């Protein structure tokens, strides 16, 4: 599976450092980047990721996070509200429809749940899988 590079919440955009990393990173691996500071969510970063077939991790830690596809595969991460709480079935069904469209376009989709403070992650992952296959 892919390797996730998660940046700290208050580490602002540094395209030079990202470029250095991407040039040094083995291209045989799938790299996903979870940016938690909104300054990273810009066209320069998206283009850089795309040139290296690295995925922008689409997550729910930043309000209105863009669903920008930067690779020939997709990386989704569901954190929940402060890493807890269960996702509502309607939300998971909507996510499943979006995932189905990506799969239909020939993309691999990786979806991870991190809302495990009360143990909901496994149940939510099973629900999402059922909705995608259903």
Named regions from a protein language model:
Residues 1-134:
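Residues lining hydrophobic/aromatic ligand-binding pockets adjacent to catalytic sites
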